[in-house]
């Protein structure tokens, strides 16, 4: 015999839907939970979001404020000096992209890590520690626009 037919929801977990407007005896008749008269008692009687009955709404009473710099921000792709150790000769944004270190955009080289080979590094920006590390290894730093 299957146990599936004996399965039932836990007692008290199921509620019958409220049958609104189906006679006074139901307890939900008469005004059908809408109160007496007025706009909200009518069909389609909702007011739009933010409407305050004709009073100037809060979002129009308060002034605009703030500024977003997102459109003008300079977002640099970050590469550390230690990640340049696998390169030889010249390092450019194109070679960094080909190696999968950056996706696109301007590049900033930071000074974390060690560099033992002399490299010519071309990037849009360098930190002071990155410049020192590259030049200490016998390399050159070139800032590109």
Swiss-Prot record:
UniProt feature coiled coil, ranges: none
Single GO term (MF): rRNA binding
Gene Ontology biological process: translation
InterPro entries found in the cross-reference section: Ribosomal_uL15, Ribosomal_uL15/eL18, Ribosomal_uL15/eL18_sf, Ribosomal_uL15_bac-type, Ribosomal_uL15_CS
GO cellular-component term (any): cytosolic large ribosomal subunit
Region listing for Disordered, in residue ranges: 1-55
Biased composition (Gly residues): 22-32
Residue ranges with Basic residues bias: 12-21
Gene3D superfamilies cross-referenced by the UniProt entry: 3.100.10.10
Keyword line: Ribonucleoprotein, Ribosomal protein, RNA-binding, rRNA-binding
Oligomeric and partner information: Part of the 50S ribosomal subunit.
Protein's job: Binds to the 23S rRNA.
Protein family membership: Belongs to the universal ribosomal protein uL15 family.
UniProt xrefs under HAMAP family: Ribosomal_uL15 (MF_01341)
NCBIfam families assigned to the protein according to its UniProt record, in alphabetical order: rplO_bact
UniProt name for this protein: Large ribosomal subunit protein uL15
């Amino acid at each position: 015999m299957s146990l599936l037919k004996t399965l039932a929801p836990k007692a008290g977990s199921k509620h019958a839907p409220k049958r609104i407007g189906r006679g006074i005896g139901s307890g939900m008749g008469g005004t059908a939970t809408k109160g007496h008269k007025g706009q909200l008692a009518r069909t389609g009687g909702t007011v739009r979001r933010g409407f305050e009955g004709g009073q100037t709404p809060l979002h129009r009473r308060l002034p605009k404020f703030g500024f977003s710099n997102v459109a003008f921000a300079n977002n640099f792709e970050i590469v550390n000096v230690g990640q340049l150790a696998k390169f030889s000769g010249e390092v450019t944004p194109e070679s960094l992209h080909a190696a999968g270190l950056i996706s696109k955009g301007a590049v900033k080289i930071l000074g974390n890590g060690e560099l033992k080979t002399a490299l010519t590094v071309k990037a849009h920006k360098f930190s002071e520690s990155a410049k020192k590390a590259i030049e200490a290894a016998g390399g050159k730093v070139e800032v590109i626009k």
